[in-house]
C-alpha cells in the first residue's frame, strides 16, 4: 500500500514539474547585437507549412532562453545547446501569423547573469512549400559510391524515407 502511494506521489510530482512555466529572467544588460546562430536564419521568409527552424547558438552562454512571438501564444524554449522548437506549437504559430512576422528574442545566461540580444524576425508567407524534397545521399568522400541512396524528406516535418538504395537494388 505504501509503495502504491509512493508511485502515485512520484507521478503527480513529475506531472507538476512538466507543467512549469518559463519565468522571464531578469536581464542585466541588453547587448544590442544579433545572436550568432547556425544555420543563419535571421530575416528569413518562411512558407506557412515549413518544419521548425531548429538552430544552434554559437555565442558563449551557459543557458539560453528563446522566445518566438507573433499573434497567438508565444513559444518559450530553454536550451543548453541546440534549440529545438516543438512542432505542434510551431505549426499553430505559423498558421496564426500567415502574412505577418514572428519576432525571436534570445537571452543568454553567463556566470549567473542574463543578457538579452537584439531580436530578429522571420516573415511568414501565406504560400505553402512543396511537400517533399528528393535528394541523392552519398558519403562526402565518394569512397563509398556503392552505398548511395535516393531519399526524400517531408518538408513540413523531419520525416525522411529512402526511395531506392544501391544496397537494395544490387
Language-model features, listed with the residues they occupy:
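Sequence signature of WD/YWTD-type beta-propeller architectures
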Residues: 19-170
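Bacterial Sec-dependent N-terminal signal peptides
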Residues: 1-26
Amino acid at each position: 500500500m505504501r509503495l502504491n502511494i509512493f508511485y502515485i506521489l512520484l507521478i503527480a510530482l513529475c506531472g507538476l514539474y512538466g507543467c512549469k512555466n518559463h519565468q522571464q529572467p531578469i536581464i542585466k544588460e541588453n547587448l544590442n547585437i544579433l545572436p550568432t546562430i547556425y544555420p543563419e536564419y535571421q530575416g528569413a521568409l518562411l512558407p506557412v507549412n515549413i518544419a521548425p527552424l531548429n538552430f544552434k547558438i554559437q555565442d558563449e552562454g551557459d543557458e539560453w532562453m528563446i522566445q518566438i512571438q507573433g499573434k497567438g501564444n508565444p513559444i518559450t524554449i530553454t536550451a543548453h545547446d541546440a534549440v529545438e522548437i516543438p512542432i505542434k506549437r510551431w505549426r499553430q504559430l505559423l498558421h496564426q501569423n500567415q502574412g505577418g512576422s514572428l519576432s525571436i528574442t534570445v537571452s543568454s545566461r553567463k556566470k549567473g547573469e542574463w543578457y538579452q540580444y537584439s531580436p530578429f524576425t522571420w516573415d511568414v508567407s501565406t504560400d505553402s512549400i512543396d511537400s517533399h524534397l528528393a535528394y541523392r545521399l552519398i558519403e562526402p568522400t565518394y569512397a563509398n559510391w556503392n552505398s548511395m541512396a535516393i531519399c526524400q524528406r517531408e518538408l513540413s516535418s523531419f520525416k525522411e524515407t529512402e526511395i531506392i538504395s544501391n544496397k537494395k537494388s544490387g
